[in-house]
Amino acid sequence: MKVKSILSEGKQIQLATELVRLGARLQVLEVSTTLSRERLVKLYKEVKGVSPPKGMLPYSEDWFTGWQPNMHSSLFINIYNYITQYTNVRDIDAIIKSYQLYLEHIEVNHLQCILSFTRAWTLVRFVESKVLSVTSCVKCTGNFLVHSLDIQSNHVCGLCHVPSRAGKTKRAAAQKAKEAQEVEIREACAV
């Protein structure tokens, strides 16, 4: 009979709860904790109020190199690298702390959250397995993500070389229309 420590099981439940609250998928919970799948499903339902989503995890390193996802992914991986380099926080705890700081930055700057926790977890795995790597921009020297096997060496980040269609999303158009309407209202009230 296997002897289980109540304290260690409590820590695993606490970790799984934190991961669920951050939006981790069931597969991430299974890899990150020692709890059984059945207990994780029950915990997920208890925390979220719904069954965990089914299906495969997102698995495309190309997603991280698109303009907007690259900005958010680069921000996250730079936070993660800083935390792992200058603190004793490692593994899933480092991913959690980094993701919390990423979310805080997004909230403070009123930005749309592009990077989910599961994608952040996948990103760390891609960087650790050298599928993706961090390189410096030749213009601003900021660090950003690129494919590890890219032959080009003079990398320019998405902030220094913004694509022509950047920021032209439906959300940006709606925000622009809202701001224009607010200006019209202020001008009408000023008369």
From Swiss-Prot:
It is found in: Cytoplasm. GO terms for molecular function: DNA binding; zinc ion binding. GO terms for biological process: bacterial-type flagellum organization; positive regulation of DNA-templated transcription; regulation of bacterial-type flagellum assembly. Its cofactor is Zn(2+). Binds 1 zinc ion per subunit. GO terms for cellular component: cytoplasm. It comes from the Bacteria. Coiled coil: none annotated. InterPro entries: FlhC. Zn(2+) binds at residues 137, 140, 157, 160. Its main location: cytoplasm. Keywords: Activator, Bacterial flagellum biogenesis, Cytoplasm, DNA-binding, Metal-binding, Transcription, Transcription regulation, Zinc. It holds the Pfam family FlhC. Heterohexamer composed of two FlhC and four FlhD subunits. Each FlhC binds a FlhD dimer, forming a heterotrimer, and a hexamer assembles by dimerization of two heterotrimers. Belongs to the FlhC family. Functions in complex with FlhD as a master transcriptional regulator that regulates transcription of several flagellar and non-flagellar operons by binding to their promoter region. Activates expression of class 2 flagellar genes, including fliA, which is a flagellum-specific sigma factor that turns on the class 3 genes. Also regulates genes whose products function in a variety of physiological pathways. This is Flagellar transcriptional regulator FlhC. It comes from Nitrosomonas eutropha (strain DSM 101675 / C91 / Nm57). The gene is flhC.
